[in-house]
């Protein structure tokens, strides 16, 4: 009997797949760890632990290690709150159970594998897609095989070694997600798009190379997606099993293929779904009216996309690519208004240009222009925070201002770097304190004048109060010192979707 079959037949749990705490708001199904679990099914015993559901994650892990003999603990790690909990838990496990092997995967360790492995409490990093690589690592460790054959693996062998990158895996070739490993009912909730909303992933990658994007750094302009038929069938299963009536597509670029989008929209028309996804503005603008009508008729309620900047020069520095221009955004805002689909335009303000203050004022004027065309348009504001992307002009421009990342995980726990992770108050040596204040103050006034649709706890009275408080400032372009706006938003616990989920 092979080691993997022995592991699968044993009563204990060999592997814990951990999704660290990321949000205090509505939890989403931890699709990333379920994707890893899919390749372990029938081979190794494993448990999925979600820090967004289990607020005693350390105690749960300790119990499983003690009572069931867990040998491997694997964390998926995004920058921000997940990184903080992953560091603390990994350190505790290493101190209390030094024989347990600790593996990290996800965007943060993919971009910072050397820093992660410099910590004595992380043994291995799986870079990029780990769907098959993680299982291959366990195979090698359980059967005494060579580590050099595991694609995307980084490990310590006298020095840090990085194996060849895992080629992008077509999701059509992957096994179905083991939803039975989590209590799906706990992840279904009320959102702006529906009363029983679930998250779903239908594609990987993106065909563009934006210089501020971790997806572009990992996938290098490649994209692949499930068929429209498969997506529609899966959503029908969710509806029949759990009464789901709304779907958030967490793809990095759901709308890459117009043919797939049209077929999907036609397949789910009349089935009682509403849905949300992420897109490229120029891709959507090129869609035929027939596709737009089908999307609207099928329940497409809101689309998130990167407007980024109202400056063609800044878009070029970002390597936005495609055919996107500021005019693209204005035309799309009008088109989406006609079809009754709400656009969520995200902006990345404060890029390291010689004219950063002038660019900011241009972006503020541009955002106001969008709101005149389509008052329903949601505006999401981020401050540019560099992504480890060695051949990107934008990243190199940041480094020219002496920007550099922390070289230890302990330094990533410092308050300024935790704020950096959330793209709200990043470490940006090229931005003055006055410029940062200008961005934050404009955002406060904008959010008061146009409260986000996604904050469901705001009733008509609260929304009216916000609008009244923000209207005079917005109307006169008076953004400095909006203390009354900040106080009201604090009292109403105003939520920002870019921080707490859309």
Placement of each model-derived feature along the sequence:
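A short, glycine/small-residue-rich beta-strand->loop->alpha-helix junction that serves as a flexible
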Residues: 22-31, 78-83
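Glycine-rich beta-alpha loop elements in corrinoid/cobalamin-binding modules
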Residues: 14, 39-40, 44-167, 390-391
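Flexible glycine/acidic-rich beta-alpha junction loops that bind and position SAM and/or redox cofactors
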Residues: 112-113, 208, 259, 313-318, ...
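Radical SAM [4Fe-4S] cluster-binding motif and immediate context
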Residues: 179-343, 349-353
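N-terminal [4Fe-4S]-dependent radical SAM core
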Residues: 2-15, 150, 156-199
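Radical SAM enzyme core and accessory elements
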Residues: 1-17, 62-71, 92, 99, ...
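Structural recognition of alpha->loop->beta junctions
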Residues: 115-132, 294-303, 362-383
